[in-house]
């Protein structure tokens, strides 16, 4: 009982701060809040959501590069992958969500060894290499590798 009174008090305070003058429930179950300016808060929120959606739809390659600064293909993470085998194997697991073409494009010929390692070791070994990601010295392969992908001089 005491916690529901606190909750109700918090709701009333929130409504007062936002100048809400009336609260009504519509037939579809949504709650509409009328403000002193006469505009429904629900309509305003819907309008703001559509603006955000339209901004999100106009993304450029610059936006994508900014995300990559903190993402899977950030230069700092790629350098760390070159130094740490266990970190590299964890990141390879996250690369499975992308196509090989996309990964190759993101690496931009700066990290060809990572791509070759991803294709020749991680993809060929499957779950066996993931099982030993914390101790890469214990990795064993049960299947023979049937094909290798090599970098060319072109």
Curated annotation (Swiss-Prot):
Extent of motif PP1c-binding motif: 138
One cellular component term from this protein's GO annotations in UniProt: host cell nucleoplasm
Cytoplasm among keywords: no
Domain of life: Eukaryota
Motif (RxLR-dEER): 53-67
Stretch forming the signal peptide: 1-22
Annotated compartments: Secreted; Host nucleus, Host nucleoplasm; Host nucleus, Host nucleolus
Induction: Expression is up-regulated during the biotrophic phase of infection on potato plants.
Keyword set, alphabetical order: Host nucleus, Secreted, Signal, Virulence
Free-text comment about domains: The RxLR-dEER motif acts to carry the protein into the host cell cytoplasm through binding to cell surface phosphatidylinositol-3-phosphate.
Family designation: Belongs to the RxLR effector family.
Function description: Effector that interacts with isoforms of host protein phosphatase type 1c (PP1c), mimicking a regulatory subunit and causing their re-localization within the host nucleus. The holoenzymes formed with PP1c isoforms act to promote late blight by attenuating jasmonic acid (JA)- and salicylic acid (SA)-mediated transcriptional responses of the host plant.
Quaternary data: Interacts with the potato PP1c family proteins PP1c-1, PP1c-2 and PP1c-3.
Name by which UniProt lists this protein: RxLR effector protein PexRD24
Gene name as annotated: PexRD24
């Amino acid at each position: 009982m005491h916690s529901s009174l606190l909750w109700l008090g918090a709701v009333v305070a929130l409504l007062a701060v936002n100048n809400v003058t009336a609260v009504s429930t519509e037939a579809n179950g949504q709650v509409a809040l009328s403000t002193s300016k006469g505009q429904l808060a629900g309509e305003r929120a819907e309008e703001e959501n559509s603006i955000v959606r339209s901004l999100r739809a106009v993304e450029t390659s610059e936006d994508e590069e900014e995300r990559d600064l903190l993402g899977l293909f950030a230069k700092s993470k790629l350098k760390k992958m070159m130094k740490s085998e266990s970190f590299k194997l964890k990141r390879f697991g996250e690369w499975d969500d992308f196509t090989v073409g996309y990964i190759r494009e993101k690496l931009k010929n700066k990290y060809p060894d990572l791509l070759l390692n991803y294709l020749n070791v991680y993809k060929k070994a499957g779950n066996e290499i993931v099982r030993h990601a914390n101790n890469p010295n214990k990795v064993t392969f049960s299947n023979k590798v049937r094909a290798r992908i090599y970098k060319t001089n072109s």
